[in-house]
Regions:
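C-terminal single-pass transmembrane alpha-helix
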Residues: 249-287
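N-terminal targeting/regulatory segments, especially signal peptides of secretory
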Residues: 1-252
Length: 287
């Protein structure tokens, strides 16, 4: 039976760093309006205006007012950015109202992106955000890659906080690892090829290929945390105490398929000469 303090181990809205950044970014850029239209299979009115404002927000976030938060984990924020750009490019033709020219809107957006990414390519400053464009046709599989990337960001953030041990933070961390481990276990069981798919190999510490290392079994004691690398699913109570170990070698078939939707946020930084070019690109939308 759960103890009275089990509720302390439930993840709050501010406990997951990647989620916090994503929600703030989506609100600032109004990305949710675009995403909602996609999810509801509706048209987005005035797509040209929406893209114009979206570009302006990107300029402000990443080129005019970049934060240390973006620069400190710019590799991750760059992957986020590429994810969302590929998402938007994919769905512009699908959700643009028939009264607007979706091909023209998409082309102008692509030209805008060329200007921004070119600025990063030629900027040698180590104090500014940089990002390389990775052009890919958007597929639902990319959502899962993003889910894995977000998990690893949250995992790293938890481990940094746990350098000074706190049992409640530990059991929140354990809950998050267990939840994501179960989720990706189901994914791999449904699509076994994903386990060795290079798209799910973000780095040596964040990869489905090394499942047990990416998703360790976490036990939270009074004064320390124990992590064991294992492909086994760790069934724990909310305080992280091991109650059952269920062996599963990730090679089974026919488990329930569970693909999630979850978009995020992204990162950019500035070069004054290119900033002018990008702003000029914005005005093309108003011609």
């Amino acid at each position: 039976m759960p103890s009275p303090r089990d509720s302390e181990c439930i993840l709050g809205e501010n406990d997951l760093q990647a989620n916090v950044f994503d929600e703030k970014w989506k609100k600032t850029t109004k990305f949710s309006e675009f995403e909602d239209a996609v999810n509801l299979d509706q048209k987005l009115n005035k797509m040209g205006d929406w893209i114009f404002n979206f570009d302006a927000k990107i300029l402000n976030i990443y080129m005019v007012n970049p934060t240390d938060e973006l620069i400190n984990i710019q590799d991750k924020r760059c992957r986020d950015l590429n994810y969302y750009i590929n998402y938007v490019l994919h769905y512009i033709p699908k959700i643009t109202n028939h009264r607007e020219n979706s091909a023209e809107i998409k082309e102008k957006f692509e030209n805008f992106l060329i200007g921004i990414f070119s600025s990063w390519k030629h900027d040698r400053s180590s104090k500014k955000f940089k990002c390389t464009r990775v052009e890919k046709d958007y597929t639902p599989k990319m959502e899962l890659i993003k889910e894995l990337d977000d998990f690893c960001e949250n995992k790293d953030a938890f481990k940094a906080k746990l350098k000074t041990y706190d049992k409640i933070k530990c059991c929140k961390y354990a809950n998050h690892v267990n939840n994501r481990k179960s989720f990706f276990h189901n994914i791999i069981s449904s699509v076994p090829s994903y386990k060795n798919d290079l798209d799910f190999h973000i780095n040596e510490k964040c990869t489905l290929k090394k499942f047990g290392a990416t998703f360790p079994n976490v036990t939270c004691n009074e004064h320390n945390m124990i992590e064991i690398e294992s492909d086994a699913l760790n069934i724990t109570n909310p305080r992280g105490k091991l109650t059952e170990l269920q062996e599963n070698h990730l090679s089974g078939t026919n488990p329930e398929d569970s693909f999630n939707n979850s978009p995020t946020k992204i990162a950019f930084t500035s070069v004054s000469t290119i900033l002018g070019a990008c702003i000029s690109g914005l005005y093309l939308y108003k011609v």
